[in-house]
Curated annotation (Swiss-Prot):
Keywords: Cytoplasm, Transferase, tRNA processing. Part of a sulfur-relay system required for 2-thiolation of 5-methylaminomethyl-2-thiouridine (mnm(5)s(2)U) at tRNA wobble positions. Accepts sulfur from TusA and transfers it in turn to TusE. Heterohexamer, formed by a dimer of trimers. The hexameric TusBCD complex contains 2 copies each of TusB, TusC and TusD. The TusBCD complex interacts with TusE. One of its GO terms (molecular function) is sulfur carrier activity. It comes from Escherichia coli O127:H6 (strain E2348/69 / EPEC). PANTHER family: PROTEIN YCHN, SULFURTRANSFERASE TUSD. InterPro entries: DsrEFH-like, Sulphur_relay_DsrE/F-like, Sulphur_relay_TusD/DsrE. This is Sulfurtransferase TusD. Its main location: cytoplasm.
Length: 128
């Protein structure tokens, strides 16, 4: 089956993103296709490359990045939600006159169209 995941919780502070990541790993391990992960609302914090967990904690931001690199899973970040929460790529940082960007490599700023497309092309969409 082909899946898409929607993550609405931050990398740390709630269980949503961690559960979504574990679900994503289980899907791939069972031979399913994970087409994309769409990060919305506070979920956009999963793409902040400035996140620095304690040395004894799992680095969820880099975990998502590794999922993208190893399995080609698209990591789409809602651009409107990201800008409101201070998560920007180089293009948006330049456009807004910000000194730097903080979008973790492997993540892409995108609109709700990416979520709509995933909903149309996947067998299941699971929200965390």
């Amino acid at each position: 089956m082909r899946f898409a995941i929607v993550v609405t919780g931050p990398a740390y502070g709630t269980q949503q993103a961690s559960s979504a990541f574990q679900f994503a790993q289980a899907l791939i391990a069972e031979g399913h296709e994970l087409s994309s992960v769409f990060f919305y609302r506070e979920g956009v914090y999963n793409a902040n490359q400035l996140t620095s967990p304690a040395s004894d904690e799992f680095d969820l931001v880099r975990g998502w990045q590794q999922l993208n690199a190893q399995h080609g899973v698209a990591l789409n970040i809602c651009v409107a939600a990201a800008l409101r929460r201070g998560v920007v790529d180089e293009t948006e940082a330049g456009r807004l006159g910000l000194a730097s960007s903080n979008l973790q490599p492997g993540f892409t700023l995108s609109g709700l169209g990416a979520l709509a497309e995933a909903s149309l092309t996947c067998d299941r969409v699971v929200q965390f």
